[in-house]
Swiss-Prot record:
Belongs to the RecX family. Signal peptide: none annotated. It is found in: Cytoplasm. It comes from the Bacteria. Keywords: Cytoplasm. The keyword ATP-binding does not apply. It comes from Neisseria meningitidis serogroup C / serotype 2a (strain ATCC 700532 / DSM 15464 / FAM18). This is Regulatory protein RecX. The lineage of its organism: Bacteria, Pseudomonadati, Pseudomonadota, Betaproteobacteria, Neisseriales.
Length: 153
C-alpha cells in the first residue's frame, strides 16, 4: 500500500502538469485536506512563492482557447475560475484578432457561404455558442468568404 501524499505534494504534482487557478486547485485538493485551515495555508504558500498564479493561469487559458472561442465565452470561463473581470479584460485578444478567429472558426466548420436564411442562422448560432458577440458574428458572416478580407478591414 502506498503512503498518503501530503497536501503540499499533491498541490505540487497538480501544478507541475498544468497551470491551475486558485479555485481550481482548492477544488482538487479539498477532498484530501484534513481541515479548511490546512488547505488555505497551502494555497497561500503556493501563491506567495508564485508557484500558483491566477494571472499565469488566465494567460495560458486565453492562449489555448482564443483561436476557437470568443471573448464572451473566455470571460465567463475565467470568471468561473475566480479570475476577476479586469484581469480577463486586459488579457483578452483585441477586436480585429477576435474577428479573424471567428472567420477562421466559421470557415473550418462550414466550407461555403450560407445558401439561405436557415443556414445563415445556423452559422450565426454556431458562432454565438462559441462566445463571439453579435457584432463579431455579423462581421464574420459578411466577410468569411471574401477573398480580399484582411485583418480588421
Amino acid at each position: 500500500m502506498k503512503p498518503q501524499k501530503s497536501l503540499r505534494a499533491r498541490a505540487m504534482d497538480i501544478l507541475s502538469r498544468q497551470e491551475v487557478s486558485r479555485i481550481g486547485l482548492k477544488r482538487k485538493l479539498a477532498p484530501h485536506a484534513e481541515s479548511e485551515e490546512e488547505l488555505e495555508n497551502v494555497l497561500n504558500e503556493f501563491a506567495e512563492r508564485n508557484w500558483q498564479s491566477d494571472l499565469r493561469y488566465a494567460e495560458a487559458y486565453i492562449r489555448s482557447k482564443s483561436r476557437k472561442h470568443g471573448s464572451l465565452r473566455l470571460k465567463q470561463a475565467l470568471a468561473q475560475q475566480g479570475i476577476d473581470e479586469e484581469t480577463s479584460r486586459n488579457l483578452l485578444p483585441d477586436r480585429s484578432s477576435e474577428k479573424q478567429a471567428a472567420i477562421d472558426v466559421l470557415r473550418k466548420k462550414f466550407k461555403h457561404p450560407a445558401a439561405d436564411l436557415k443556414e445563415k442562422q445556423k452559422q450565426a448560432r454556431f458562432l454565438a455558442y462559441r462566445g463571439f458577440d453579435a457584432d463579431t458574428v455579423q462581421t464574420a458572416l459578411k466577410h468569411a468568404w471574401d477573398e480580399n478580407w484582411e485583418d480588421g478591414c
